Amino acid sequence: MECIAIVLLQQFIGISWWWLLVPVLSYKFLIIWGSANIRSNFYTKAHCSAETSEKVIAISFDDGPHPEYTPKVLAVLAEYQAPATFFVIGKNIAGNELIIRRIHENGHILGNHTWSHSFFIDFKGKKAFREELSATCDAVYNIIRKRMNFFRPPYGVTTPHLAAAARAEKNHIIGWNIRSLDTTSDSEMKIFYRIKAEIRPGAVILFHDTSAKTVEVLKQTLNFAKENGFKIVSTGELLKLKAYA
């Protein structure tokens, strides 16, 4: 319909259709960019870092719980006495309830990463999105008896329906400003040097507790933070937000 309207308008006023197409394409690009860039705050506010000169940072993990790697991540965090936030996928909880309990009892924060983490989740409406959030929240509540306030959108993509669902569930949307790319790179060195180059006061680092390389890079990151005077704090403390209802 947009293309037909452009052609008719071009015929009526005699302007090259290329000039009429520019604002349409610009608008489309803006929508795509705003949706895909969680730090843009395009549809909703996302807390991605803290404005501070103090050398404090927060660490977060997506896509767990994983029966093999989440316990290894927890062991590393315990060794360095570092808090973290775990954004869990609801469908991964069954069979891993003890890991969820261990995350909580070790003093870490649990956050919502939807129930399915479907590749097509961003096409869901508000009602379906709320079901994704509430089902995961209920599953975690049944284990730790606390309701999660933190929500991280799958793939970091936001939509109007996601924003409406998060508001309805009274969730804080938590993003990041350092993406480790630990799911796309096979090189532990590249992942670590990417983090090392970007680390700064107030940063929120995104990892995934789903692979052996993340466990090794986490050790390197925590060593680097310690050697360079960075303190690891929880996302709640860093962003001054309440993690549970």
What residue ranges belong to the model's regions?
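Short, solvent-exposed loop/turn segments at secondary-structure boundaries
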Residues: 122-127, 185-187
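CE4/NodB-like, metal-dependent polysaccharide N-deacetylase domain
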Residues: 74-88, 108-109, 125-157, 164, ...
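A short acidic, amphipathic alpha-helical/loop segment
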Residues: 72-73, 98-102, 161-165, 217-221
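A cross-domain feature marking catalytic cores of carbohydrate-active enzymes
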Residues: 61, 88-90, 112-114, 153-155, ...
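Short, acidic/polar
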Residues: 23, 67-74, 187-191
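Terminal accessory/targeting
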Residues: 1-58, 75-85, 197-245
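Active-site beta->alpha N-cap acidic-glycine motif
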Residues: 31-124, 132-135, 139, 147-148, ...
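His/Asp/Glu-enriched short active-site or ligand-binding loop at hydrolase and phosphoryl-transfer sites
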Residues: 157-159, 163-198, 230-242
